[in-house]
Curated annotation (Swiss-Prot):
Pathway: Isoprenoid biosynthesis; isopentenyl diphosphate biosynthesis via DXP pathway; isopentenyl diphosphate from 1-deoxy-D-xylulose 5-phosphate: step 5/6
Record bears the keyword Oxidoreductase: yes
GO molecular function: 4 iron, 4 sulfur cluster binding; 4-hydroxy-3-methylbut-2-en-1-yl diphosphate synthase activity (ferredoxin); 4-hydroxy-3-methylbut-2-enyl-diphosphate synthase activity (flavodoxin); iron ion binding
Organism: Chlamydia caviae (strain ATCC VR-813 / DSM 19441 / 03DC25 / GPIC)
Positions contributing to [4Fe-4S] cluster binding: 513, 516, 547, 554
Gene that this polypeptide is encoded by: ispG
Name of the top EC class for this enzyme: oxidoreductase
Cofactors, names only: [4Fe-4S] cluster
GO BP, one annotated term: terpenoid biosynthetic process
Keyword Metal-binding: yes
Coiled-coil intervals: none
Gene3D superfamilies: Dihydropteroate synthase-like (3.20.20.20), Sulfite Reductase Hemoprotein, domain 1 (3.30.413.10)
Stated name of the protein: 4-hydroxy-3-methylbut-2-en-1-yl diphosphate synthase (flavodoxin)
EC number: 1.17.7.3
Length: 606
């Protein structure tokens, strides 16, 4: 992260400008929003129609899948149709496994995306093959030989390129030497850019995607560091691959992309959500709105104040002693007086995920609640105390911003919690706070509040600001104050943020691709059905992937996979291994359940 001495905040990483069609990306230009079509690319009219819808939604770059020469030729007609309609949105071709398609389509599109894991080398098939130093060196020579024609053609035509590394599809050669590590991802990217540099071609953008936000953030940080150390200031395209469906997908994207944006990294972004591609753009817009604030703060810092506050979120550097709630990362929800006056205890318990009859808690039931002080001692609160920890909102001080005097005050050092109001430069000042306090023997628990009314905006903002700290281990609990959002949704936002940051697993996790022209079934519908069947299997990771091109690789972190193999057929995976092939679609979901039973991870829903 680059810290501006005058503002103590992130500054946007310097990147050179890359021309993509009629626009430029780089630090001198606005951060661009992009998406990808889900129509078969060979269906020119359907693809053009979907791109027009993306343009209407304010998408700035459109990508299409190009799996062969037929699709490459279709791109010529797609581009012609768009231009005839006065639509000049840059068109990007997505290439996997087939360099000839890249060479052909470069004539028609504005940018070519290649995956270093499968452009020249074979995708890792976990065969255990060993590469000697000579084998490895020979492979690099072959890479340069095969990759050079595309680089030379793009340079000659003035076309851009994205070197798009995916954590789940590193080549066999890289995996054998480095494993599926951050180092392996960075090496995979650098091998290709070294060829570009040798040929004097710099119209290149990088991406370092993973379905795991923790891996994704670490990979981008490391690549940016390594590129800058070489004096190579290439732009970055940000994305959490196969983020998923609905609020879970939005939150996972926001944790990864939002964290990096607040650090000044990123020149283009995409939120890979399962469903209609136009739904991705509002999420991108919201992310840019919430994170740009961190890069555009006034030079005069906000006045410091230490006051009482009504809500808090604990963000301590590390757990140094047992927390009152017993969980490493607790979840607390602020209840308004309206919640307490207008609902029965039974209704409140249901909304908080607790069975009022037997007291059984849902996996996403909070650890406690924050209530107005005037309600302490009432019969309602006493009944809620039987199931939850209860705090009132005057028990801890509130830190609206940080300076040395406040950091070292007895009021902060001795408080059980310290509220920190989550307004920019909240993320950066919080990190600085912990850097100064981590050597102090007395644990300081810093907590922060967020008060938002809109469900969608709340999810993006909380996932970005809380997630950015949680990813780096700065946090012990989250407490949300969302009076106009339903309590079940507040719980979902809180626990999805913790799960996406990898600090508390309370739900089944789904890795589902957004779909593209290769998709072989209705992804949103099937993903929703599988979620309903398996959502009670806490801690399990299930991938739902539209095709076998990216599916087996992109579901690297999953325990089980449901992958389209051909039209109307599904393959089922355990980790990286296909264990059941070509299952008719109508039987596949039940076969997945049977597979889970065979591996002893299935249990009937309660």
């Amino acid at each position: 992260m680059v810290i501006s001495p005058s503002k103590k905040q992130a500054a946007r990483r310097h990147t050179h400008s890359v021309k993509i069609g009629n626009l430029y990306v780089g630090s001198e230009h606005s951060i661009k929003m992009q998406s990808m079509t889900t129509t078969p690319t060979a269906d020119v009219e359907a693809t053009v129609t979907q791109i027009c819808a993306l343009v209407e939604a304010k998408c700035e770059i459109a990508r299409v899948t190009v799996q062969g020469i037929k699709e490459a030729q279709a791109c010529e007609h797609i581009k012609e149709r768009l231009l005839s309609m006065g639509i000049a949105i840059p068109l990007v071709a997505d290439i996997h496994f087939f360099p000839q398609a890249a060479m052909h389509v470069a004539d028609f599109v504005d940018k070519v995306r290649i995956n270093p894991g499968n452009f020249v080398d074979k995708r890792n098939m976990f065969t255990g093959k060993t590469y000697t130093d000579k084998n490895y060196a020979d492979s690099l020579l072959r890479l340069e030989e095969k990759f050079t024609p595309l680089v030379e053609k793009c340079k000659r035509l003035g076309k851009a390129m994205r070197i798009g590394v995916n954590h789940g599809s590193l080549s066999e050669r890289v995996m054998q030497r480095y494993g599926d590590t951050i180092e392996g991802m960075v090496v995979s990217a650098l091998e290709y850019i070294e060829v570009c540099e040798k040929l004097g071609y710099r119209d290149v953008v990088f991406s370092m995607k993973s379905s795991n936000p923790k891996v994704m953030v670490a990979a981008y940080r490391q690549l940016a560091k390594d590129l800058d150390a070489r004096g190579w200031h290439y732009p970055l395209h940000l994305g959490v691959t196969e983020a998923g469906i609905g609020l879970d997908g939005i939150i996972k994207s926001a944790v990864g992309i939002g964290t990096l944006l607040t650090e000044g990294l990123g020149d283009t972004i995409r939120c890979s959500l399962t469903g209609c591609p136009t739904t991705e753009i509002p999420v991108c817009e919201s992310l840019l709105k919430h994170t740009t604030t961190y890069l555009d703060l006034p030079k005069k810092e906000n006045p410091f104040a230490l006051e009482n506050s009504e809500t808090f979120v604990n963000a301590s550097k590390k757990i140094t002693k047992a927390t009152p709630w017993g969980s490493v990362y607790g979840v607390f929800i602020k209840l308004m007086k309206e919640h307490l006056l207008n609902n029965t205890v039974e209704k409140l318990l249901e909304q908080l995920g607790i069975n009022p009859t037997n007291g059984k808690k849902d996996f996403t039931a909070p650890d406690g609640i924050i209530v107005p002080k005037s309600f302490i001692g009432t019969s309602v609160i006493e009944k809620l105390k039987e199931h939850l920890l209860v705090f009132h909102h005057h028990e801890v001080p509130c830190l609206y911003n940080h300076n040395e005097e406040i950091w070292n005050s007895e009021q902060v050092l001795s408080a059980p919690f310290v509220h920190c109001h989550a307004t920019p430069p909240f993320i950066h000042s919080t990190r600085e706070f912990f850097e100064k306090k981590q050597s102090n023997e007395q644990p300081v628990k810093l907590v922060f509040s967020k008060d938002l009314d809109d469900e969608f905006e709340a999810a993006v903002s909380i996932a970005t600001e809380f997630g950015a700290l949680l990813l780096d281990g700065l946090g012990e609990a989250v407490i949300l104050d969302l009076p106009n959002v339903s309590l079940p949704t507040v719980r979902e936002i809180a626990f999805s943020t913790l799960q996406s940051a990898g600090v508390r697993l309370v739900k089944t996790e789904y890795i589902s691709c957004p779909g593209c022209g290769r998709t072989l079934f209705d992804l949103p519908e099937v993903t929703t059905r599988i979620r309903e069947k398996t959502k009670h299997l806490v801690g399990l990771k299930i991938a739902v992937m539209g095709c076998i091109v990216n599916g087996p690789g992109e579901m690297a972190d999953s325990d089980f996979g449901f992958v389209g193999s051909k039209t109307g057929m599904i393959d089922l995976y355990v980790k990286h291994t296909c264990v059941k092939a070509h299952i008719p679609m109508e039987d596949a979901e039940e076969e997945l359940v049977r597979l889970l039973q065979e591996h002893g991870v299935w249990k009937d829903p309660e």
